[in-house]
Regions:
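Methionine residue identity
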Residues: 1-5
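Active-site microenvironment for binding and transforming phosphate-containing groups
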Residues: 10, 15-255
Length: 256
């Protein structure tokens, strides 16, 4: 995968309210590969037990983009043909179960800004011009609204409140993790919907692992300032070359 050109998308959709929903929990940590109509995507088994939502993490398979964008590119800002990107959204939506005009896309700038999304935001950044910026997290309780965030190697965070029928998605790179955007998202859901953190179902999506994530000391200093010393040995280790290997997955688990 060309991480500079092909953008993967995290999709989470609030479906119609189902008032008799029961709480589900699972120890399942691995995503499953799904394929429909030639489109390949990933899902979480624990979320598939929830009739109130649909979700996916896209792959590069099943789209119409060509060359370095081949084939399921979902970014309008990388130089790909706009009509190809629109067709990719149509194909992904047909496979997963959403309409492109219901999608609300983030404008990720490594902040901890979390936006409350309403029905008036449908299509934002997808089928109509974007009306908000500097947004790395989104939450909603509006049925039919689709949240979309974008990734190369940063960490996708899913949030589902099956009690108050609400969802959230957040983009957590190292800056967002230091800023604890996961915690910010949960607090925002509590503020807006009355969500109880103990009742939330959360997940960490596909992203860079510790073995592949080398950082310099200035980044580690940020984590040392943000996290209690008792967690440091779980978050990073120093190598002989003076660099560090950083574990963003574990950092976000600690935040949750």
């Amino acid at each position: 995968m060309n991480m500079q050109m092909l953008v993967r998308v995290h999709i989470l959709k609030h479906k119609e309210n189902i008032m008799d929903i029961k709480w589900h929990s699972s120890d399942e940590t691995h995503m499953q590969v799904r394929e429909k109509n030639g489109v390949t995507f990933l899902t979480y088994p624990a979320f598939e037990n929830l009739p109130e939502i649909i979700h996916c993490f896209s792959t590069r398979l099943g789209g119409v983009s060509e060359g370095i964008f081949s084939s399921m590119n979902l970014s309008f800002t990388r130089g790909d043909n706009e009509n190809a990107v629109k067709e990719n959204y149509r194909r992904l939506g047909a496979a997963v179960g959403f309409a492109p005009e219901d999608v609300v896309s983030s404008d990720q700038t490594h902040t901890t800004n979390v936006r409350l999304v309403g029905a008036e935001d449908r299509g934002n950044g997808i089928t109509r011009p974007r009306t908000f910026h500097d947004t790395d997290g989104m939450i909603t309780n509006v049925p039919g609204v689709v949240l979309a965030t974008y990734y190369a190697d940063c960490v996708p965070l899913y949030f589902v409140d099956p009690v108050h029928h609400a969802i959230g998605l957040s983009h957590s790179g190292w800056r967002g993790t230091v800023g604890k955007i996961g915690k910010v998202t949960i607090e925002k859901m509590h503020q807006e919907f009355g969500s109880d953190p103990a009742e939330l179902l959360t997940a960490i999506g596909p992203s860079i692992c510790q073995d592949c994530y080398e950082v310099s000391e200035d980044v580690i200093l940020e984590f040392q300032n943000a996290f209690n010393e008792k967690y440091w040995n779980r978050l990073f280790y120093k190598k002989d070359n003076g660099k560090y290997q950083l574990n963003l997955w574990e950092a976000n688990r600690i935040i949750f």
